[in-house]
Amino acid sequence: MSTIRCDIVSAEQEIFHGEATFVVATGELGELGIAPKHAPLITRLKPGKVVITTVNGEQLDFAISGGILEVQPQVVTILADSAIRADTIDEVAVRKAKEEAERILANRGETIDVAKAQQQLVEAVVQMQALERLRRTVKH
């Protein structure tokens, strides 16, 4: 079975390093599927999910808040603004962050940072979607 090395890193830490048979991420122009020996590519990533299929067939789900994806013949590198494995997401904290961002955006005043609140909302929604996908996968 052919594999490709995959690395996911954020400003804070290395999130994943290992061999994969397939990687899925959301680029600016849509969803990308990357298999071993994929043509070289570089693109910006939208906030969303990254799914890595490991050599044993396991699917690992990650939530990212955006970043850059680079594909070389033997390696896929994802430089994420922030990234988290779906199975480590704190659902209560994410729900609170989402509610707080929505509250801030609903009560816009001159002193709030709208872009920051919007980014927090996007990150919370992406993490909740990753949790939901993980739950569906575990049930099957």
Swiss-Prot record:
Protein name (database record): ATP synthase epsilon chain
A Pfam family reported for this protein in Swiss-Prot or TrEMBL: ATP-synt_DE_N
Stated family: Belongs to the ATPase epsilon chain family.
Name of the encoding gene: atpC
Cellular component annotations (GO), alphabetically ordered: plasma membrane; proton-transporting ATP synthase complex
Recorded superkingdom: Bacteria
Bilayer topology term: Peripheral membrane protein
Keywords assigned: ATP synthesis, Cell inner membrane, Cell membrane, CF(1), Hydrogen ion transport, Ion transport, Membrane, Transport
Keyword Membrane carried by entry: yes
GO molecular function, one term: ATP binding
InterPro entries: ATP_F1_dsu/esu_C_sf, ATP_synth_F1_dsu/esu, ATP_synth_F1_dsu/esu_N, ATP_synth_F1_esu_C, ATPsynth_dsu/esu_N
